[in-house]
Amino acid sequence: MQSDIEICRNTPLSSIATVAANAGLLPHELDTHGKHKAKVHPQCLERLTDNQDGKLVLVTAITPTPLGEGKTVTTIGLSQGLSKINQSVMACIRQPSMGPVFGVKGGAAGGGYSQVAPMDELNLHLTGDIHAVTAAHNLASAALDARLYHEQREGYDAFEARTSLRALKIDVERITWKRVMDHNDRALRMVKIGLNEEGKNINGFEREEGFDISAASELMAILALANDLKDLRQRIGRIVVAYDLNGNPVTTEDLQVAGAMAVTLKETIAPTLMQTLEGVPTLIHAGPFANIAHGNSSIIADQIALKLSSYVVTEAGFGSDMGFEKACNIKALAADRAPDCVVIVATLRGLKANSGHYDLRPGMAIPDSIFNPDQAALEAGFENLKWHINNVHKYGIPAVVAINQFPQDSGQELAELKALIERFNPEVKVAVSTVFAQGGEGAIELAQHVVETCEQGAQFRPLYTKKQSLKEKLMAVCEVGYGASNIEMSELAKQQLAHFEKLGFDDLAVCIAKTPLSITTDSAIKGAPSGFAVPIRELRLCAGAGFVYALSGNVMTMPGLPDKPTFMNLDLDDQGNIIGLS
């Protein structure tokens, strides 16, 4: 079989103008970027306001192996399958970060015959939104350090007299805004900035600093959660970057940099339109990770797609304990729109990995032995799929299971897995998906199940209400959402929690950063554990995004590269074609 990029390169694509017209967009509602990409003006929603909303289908997964179980390929393949059965459909996905593209997982365009195309343009830069987020974020960092430098150098009274600005009196020990970049670079997790030659201070105020990956930026979450440009601007102004010497928040509005940040992000408010290999219109917008952010594409993209099509297929990062939980408790409440149906992607290898019989770690190749028939491992790992089915049902949303088939899979084991699901819950429809090898044809049964399941109707119920305290919200996610027995907060986290509530931020949602490789915070614990503790070491305030960010276990907000990163496979041929991208 051809590689992903070869399949993409050998598939004829429609012009983006044709794709847009087929979706129901007008020429003046687009800004084209070459032959196959266009920015879609959110103002098109004014014209479409009377259109009935379509059905929202969210794709999640079991607890994945480090290489993933195929959510994106299923999202794209299902959209093509729905098109095959004559349904009006669009897909909405996140913009890939170059960190994973060059790191472990590779690209995020789908794969095989279920891809967003051109896949190289999607995976590398796209229309520059992530770079704009990075620039706007680091502008706030530069403004913060400049203000700190001038106030410290001159003294507060002299600074106020000279500039007519209020001295912010920033507490250098309580700066919370790190810098960001769109690469995996562990060496930047802890750095010192503002270093000077002896006797000089021209380079700023020396302090400890760190970098996060751009996907973890609060601005990325804001872009994904904003309902329009006005909302984006207001959220940017609420960002807290530090605290003053009295413990009061210092915001981007206080630094008078919020407007310039919004200007930098002006073009990012528009989703990027592309197409699948079978011509299904696809909106790409925002790229927050699900392990260290809220893990869903934008509300604006969903709004546009729901007005243009009968079905919108989107995905949430990692397993249902991760991106799906945040889709329900953060995104759905911000959008006032919950999914009508959830597709849970499962694989034989993923379930066997959850049996505890295999030791799969990031950077390791999947062993061939995992594809050998192993009933004991399959049945033990099936507990994880049961957990995820029950988890989706906690939110009152009906579920469909898509078994993503690999070429090495045993037909007998696929039949056994279908039987296990049917015995566990006969109301949960299940289909074997072969979208990687067959495109939309491989998702026709899945598409039919999704249409039928959407008609059941959802009775959506999030895990907590806005009025509950921050601690109650954390406990709801950990105990009800994960099955933990309790949370264990560090002294630092307890102090931060009390401070946030004192400042009036207890009405915010909560976003827990944890490993995606286990339902717990320990990646070595597989299956469907219960009764465990969730250690929370630190809280971060994301007042603009609208949530408090809890760091659990040893999760890092700046990933590192493995010993054999995927960038080693990338190159250009003599004609300038990219090779090795997957």
Swiss-Prot record:
This protein's pathway reads: One-carbon metabolism; tetrahydrofolate interconversion
Name of the protein in its database record: Formate--tetrahydrofolate ligase
Pfam hit, one: FTHFS
NCBIfam families per the record?
PRK13505.1, PRK13506.1
| UniProt-listed Enzyme Commission number(s) | 6.3.4.3
| An example Gene Ontology biological process | tetrahydrofolate interconversion
Q: Which family does it belong to?
A: Belongs to the formate--tetrahydrofolate ligase family.
Q: What would you give as a GO molecular function for this chain, any one?
A: formate-tetrahydrofolate ligase activity
* Keywords associated with the record: ATP-binding, Ligase, Nucleotide-binding, One-carbon metabolism
Q: Which InterPro entries match?
A: Formate_THF_ligase, Formate_THF_ligase_CS, P-loop_NTPase
The UniProt catalytic activity note for this protein reads: (6S)-5,6,7,8-tetrahydrofolate + formate + ATP = (6R)-10-formyltetrahydrofolate + ADP + phosphate
Per UniProt, where does ATP bind?
A: T65, P66, L67, G68, E69, G70, K71, T72
